[in-house]
Amino acid sequence: ETLERVIPLLEAVLRRTAYLVLLSENPQALEQLIKLCSASSWVAEYITRTPLLLDELLVPETLYRLPDQHELQEELHLRLLRIEADDLEQQMEQTRQFVRAHKLRAAACEVMNKLPLMKISDYLTRLAETTMTMVQNLAFEQMVAKYGYPTDANKEPVYTPEFLIVGYGKVGGLELSYSSDLDLVFIHHGHPGGSTTGERSLDNGVFYTRMGQRMVHFCSTQTRSGDLYEVDLRLRPSGNSGMIVASLKAFKEYQQNHAWTWEHQALVRARVISGSSELSSSFNDIRQEILTSQRDIPELREEVRAMRQKMRDNLGSKDTNGQQFHLKQDEGGIVDIEFLVQYGVLAWSHQHPELTQVTDNMRLLDALTKAGLMAPKDCQTLQETYLSYRAETHRRALQKQSLLLESDSVSALGFDARRNDVTRLWKLWLEPEQS
């Protein structure tokens, strides 16, 4: 099996003499390569697509050490410093190489059991935050070079972008994996009557909308190293029919008057990943206000249940007579735990506003327990189950396997009992009339 994984890689390497020389002169790198390819088909394919990553194998001490956020920022800054300000193609390529190198490091640490799952997810999330902050800064600089600076109410130029990147889903919940999309919402707070200072002047709102479009283009363009991240903006106000970049005022108005319950559920995991502290604070105030609104509990339960059933019908395992279990979408799986937590936050934040202070499921479960809303034993059960499920999703991602488990795998992993535990607690919280 290892040989099957390594052969395509060797074929890719044979096309470039430099890589052959690198491996022949660095037996340690070759040893690391074989180890990693043996452990993960994803790693083997990842390096095959980008043989430049072989450089990462030269120093095991570096390969198995994940830098902190400040070090990531410094490295990306230095990579881009060498590139002309108007060389977009090279900026995109260097940013992709940076992300790929660090994803490889994370995968190496995971498959060699150097770090636990939550450290890996935190790192992949920090990597995305660092990268998207740089993408935002580059897009702003390029827009300013073309159209000048946006202006405030006094027609004075605004030198830092009044722009937020809000992370939802896995990036908001600090749970990124190797191939995760980034669920993002872009928000601006440009003065509504203002326009830019350049000769080719733009309305402030149009300036920020084009800046958002530029950021998506930067991420999605296929270069030699592929795309950067797949950015999903469907959680923005009005979804696909909404503006790519919403004003802060429009975002607030939508959340207050037009958002569905599932959009408020999504807001539970939303957090700012890039933007000014002042604007971040304004967003957090809106989020807090929405999440702590008093809700009709039976109506909320019904809406959460209906949305969950719709997802199971569309995304879960079908026609398998219980012989398969979709780890994420089926009853007793990952999404049941996520919905259960989101229901708890929406139901009780009115009395317990501290529930809105964190966005990841592990700490949200702790917060629900600390508030006396969940039994400590149930919290422990859900946390252990959630971590077990997520560890298996990571393992399967690194082996390029589906999240659809056969019944023998479910039993071997001990997931039968875990599913039953989740289903029991789901019924306790969301179907109390049937419990």
PLM regions and their residue ranges:
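A nucleotide- and high-energy phosphate-metabolite-utilizing enzyme signature
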Residues: E1-S435
